[in-house]
Amino acid sequence: MAYSAELDIRVTDTSLRDGSHHKRHQFTATEVRDIVAALDGAGVPVIEVTHGDGLGGSSFNYGFSKTPEQELVTIAAQTAKQAKIAVLMLPGVGVKEDIKVSQDNGASICRIATHCTEADVSIQHFGLARELGLETVGFLMMSHTQPPEVLAKQARIMADAGCQCVYIVDSAGALVLEQVSDRVAAVVAELGDDAQVGFHGHENLDLAVANSIYAIRAGATQIDGSARRFGAGAGNTPVEALVGVCDKLGIRTGIDFFAIADAAEDVVRPAMPQECLLDRQALMMGYAGVYSSFLKHAERQAERYGVSAAEMLVRAGRRKLVGGQEDQLIDIALELQREQQTATV
């Protein structure tokens, strides 16, 4: 199964959304303009632009944006000559009006994300997006926490609501090879021709490219990545590496390998505060199955309370915390601090 007559898969670059976590939501208008121009010039067909936690995410809980996200969406849409601009929406973080405003500002794809057992909360949002004429994509976040058959049922809910492509989303970078292909295959079998299937990976176990290939071989036709891994945790599937691997395997992406390598090195990297690294904390997230955007929050609270960020993330995994529960990291930090104080008495 191919995405289209011209492409075997369609790649979405999430540098300007997932990368917002790594940058603590401090993108400038100039950075967005330059990155969109470079990605568009390399042939990237879809570029996602929003606050890291989606439309309406600029808040005390998630972190405030340096530049209003709708301004960035507008700039991206005005800059791109061929690429479509996508926005991410988490029901409960953003509201339906945000979808309308995004479309007015030039977005043409609405990606709606829920926890992988809560697809039903997306029904009205998919309905609105389709009414507006937007292309729709659904995200089943934290897909490592549920078996294939559960994900297939949740994907059916999204597809019946109007979702045109359902993604298996490895939010924690915790899935390993066949765990990806088994989940993708189950959703492909459930949806048939009703909707496409996609995969969104993270590098917390250093498997994002390999996992993406397993997803493609299982029937996924839309794949996410970020140039230079620019994303939460250890980062996303590096688009430039994914394109190179796909070229070698004869998988058509429509992206120029040399141009995307240049864009990653010369344009995206200068906008990053530092490289996305597979360090101890990121590794713990993949191992313990922790939502990748928790990394910066955990590092900040660990410094504040004088405790181990790695241990905080392991405990977050034990508690099965999901996106939106970042505030519980403070409880974990205080718990560790009390244990340290007790141990020294």
From Swiss-Prot:
This protein's record includes keyword Amino-acid biosynthesis: no
Residues annotated as binding Mn(2+): D18, H200, H202
Residues the UniProt record annotates as site (Transition state stabilizer): R17
Residues at the active site: H21
Stored Gene3D superfamilies: 1.10.8.60, Aldolase class I
Its EC number(s): 4.1.3.39
Cited SUPFAM superfamilies: Aldolase, post-HMGL domain-like
Reaction it catalyzes: (S)-4-hydroxy-2-oxopentanoate = acetaldehyde + pyruvate
Residues reported in the UniProt entry to bind substrate: R17, D18, S171, H200, Y291
Listed GO MF terms: 2-isopropylmalate synthase activity; 4-hydroxy-2-oxovalerate aldolase activity; manganese ion binding
Domain Pyruvate carboxyltransferase positions: 9-261
Keywords for the protein's UniProt record, in alphabetical order: Aromatic hydrocarbons catabolism, Lyase, Manganese, Metal-binding
InterPro entries: 2-IPM_HCS-like, 4OH_2_O-val_aldolase, Aldolase_TIM, DmpG_comm, DRE_TIM_HOA, PYR_CT
Any one biological process term the GO annotation gives: catabolic process
Family statement drawn from the similarity comment of this UniProt entry: Belongs to the 4-hydroxy-2-oxovalerate aldolase family.
Protein name: 4-hydroxy-2-oxovalerate aldolase 1
Organism: Nocardia farcinica (strain IFM 10152)
